[in-house]
Structures are given as C-alpha cells and as structure tokens.
Amino acid sequence: RAAAFAAYRDDSRARLRAELGRVRALTEAAAVATYWTAFTAAIEESIMTRGRLARKLLNAPAVPFINGWIAYHNRHDYRGPLEPKFGDAITFRPDPERARPFGTARADWRLLQRYAPTVVQERSAQPAYPGEYDRFGSVALHGEQPDTALPAVDTDVPTVYAYIDRKRIQGVEVRQLNYTIWYPRHPAMSLFDPEAGALDGWTVRISLDQADRPRLVESVSNCGCYYKIFPGAALEAESRAAYGDRLTDKTLYIEGHVSDGVDAVVPETIPGLETAPYGITLYMSAGHHQLVTIRAHASPGDIPGDSARAYLLAAYDELEQLPFHDRRASLFAPDGLVREAHRRECVLLSPSGLYHAGHPRQRETQMIYFDEANLDDPGLLERYLRLPPRAFGAGA
C-alpha cells in the first residue's frame, strides 16, 4: 500500500510539473485565453450547485410552496438547549491503543486521539426497528463489482472516523478536528418519514486555538442538515467583553445576524471546553440519530446504565478507499453521495433546487441551511458568529 501511494504521488507530481511547464510556455494572450477556456470547461460542476436551475424549472409550480415551507422551518425551529433525558444508553470511549493510520501525520494523530469524543448513545426500550440501527460502526462494501457495491455498517466494531483540516480564520491558521460516525440505517420514525434510508451519520468539528485548546464545536448531520454551533463558555465571555450587548432576539453575545440568510443555531455554550483534559462527550438520540447536546465533562447523572465500550478511532481516508476484493473502492459515488442511500426527502425538496436533499455525503460536499452555505467555507464562523478579536490566537 505504501509503495502504491508513493508511486501515485510521484506520478501526480510529474504530471503537475509538466502541465505547469506548458502553461509557462504560453506567451500570447489568445493562447492563454484558449487554455483557460478549455481548463474551465473540463471542471465538473460541484454537487452543491449542479442542475439547481433545471430542477427549479422542472418543478416550477411547487417552488413557491417548498420555498415557503423552508422559510417557515428556518424561522420556527427550536434553537435553545436540550437535555439528554435518556432512559437507557450505552457509552463509547476511544480505544487509546489504536495505532496511527498510514498517511496521518504523527502530530495530527496525537491531536485527534487527545480530543476524541466520548459518545453516549441513547437506546430505546422497545424500538419499532432493529436495535442495531442505534449503534454506529465500521463501514464496508459488499458485492461483486465496484460500480454496484453496497455499503454496510458493522456495529460489532464501533468506529469513529477522523481527520484534521486547516482554515484561515481572523488571519490565522486554525486546526479543526473532525469526527464522523455512521449508523446502518435511519429507521422510519413515522408512517411517512422522508429522512428514512440506508446509512445515517453525524459529524462534529472542534476548532482549536494556536495553543491547541478547543474554542468551539460545530455539529451537523452527514447530509448537511441540523447545523449547530456550540461555543466554549470562555469564548462567549470574550464576546461579551468585546461587544457589550447581545443582538436583538439573541441569547448569547457571540451570536451574529446574517442579513442575507438564516442565522446559525447556537443553542448553548460548553462550560469548561477550553480546559477539558480530554475529549468532549456527545449525547446522540435513538432513532433520529441527532446530537442532543455536548458536555466538556460527562456528568454521571447524564449517563444512565453502566455499560461502556471502546471504539476504534480510524482515519476518514479509509472511507474513501475501502477494501473491496483485490482492490479498493470508495463509500461515496463520484458526485460525493453515499452509495445507495437515497431519501424520499430528495424528491420532496427537489423544487427548491437542492441536490439530493437529506442524502448522506462525503466531506467537502456538505451544504447547510438548505444550501445557503458551504460547511467547508473558511469564512463560515465569521459569517455566523460575532467572534471576539483574536478568538483563535494572535492574528488580525
């Protein structure tokens, strides 16, 4: 595997150098324009915008109704804190002995291990669906051919997939730790549940300051729905000192207002986040598989039952190169959507122009608030929050 990776890397570098050489050799403006036209024409449009206008035109009569429903949904959704009132739950903690995955830098892996979350998963006493649907696990592909392979989740091997990305926020490079879980299925929670379907999951993202201390946590479904921000209590205190007053109709000082869209949901702060010696605790609901709340330290009263299991911390890269017979294949189709995980929600919301609404998808393809913003936009936090000066350390 290491040799194949090195060969691919070297070949890619050689191809890039050759292409850059051809670009540098262009001396005439017309030649540059021709090259640029061909270059941009070869770039496939992102799933974030692909076919949006066509879908709206094809479903024109329903567009006003769907857009009105979205506006109502955004305006009236509950935005406050929730309590993890679980009758029964199982706790999953990271396995400290997990070896560093190939291709992950040692320093990055140490950070991912250090802040790997504890997951408290609610269990229904008498679910109307198989109980394993409420357990996250390891993802695999099954079938005969790569293009028809079907994904499955092995709940006997609880696994959290993690990676680090970096963004410039307020003029400084901010490390963001991403942790993703996958369930076998989103069960039907009613007679008609448009969110039901194969594979379900959740992602949390922890933004660190220059001293590698957590400052805030973002939470989102793997399809891009239900995006929320949980700032650390210390960060909220800094916003209070910087701004003095809350904005109208806001509970927290750090909450911002978006003039051209929907304001972010910021339910509550996380006391002790910046000083927590290890990972946060996530409280995940049964059935819907939504994050209920986050704690810096798990309170014994918040965790019913006494069962606990270790989970494997794995590199997110594994999802993009899963073992499949004598080769490797991705969990995701070329458009970034999880294989065979269609939702009825996609059909219902197609008049809005959304591309496969509710369909779980790959990192860097998630849109939030009904495609209003890109989850991986470096300016996302500055768009939605009134960050205090130097929120992540020295900078602008």
Residue map of PLM features:
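Domain-length functional cores that host ligand/cofactor binding and catalytic or interaction surfaces
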Residues: 1-99, 198-200, 211-396
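Charged, compositionally biased non-catalytic regions
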Residues: 78-156, 165-166
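Short N-terminal edge-element motif at the start of the domain
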Residues: 135-217
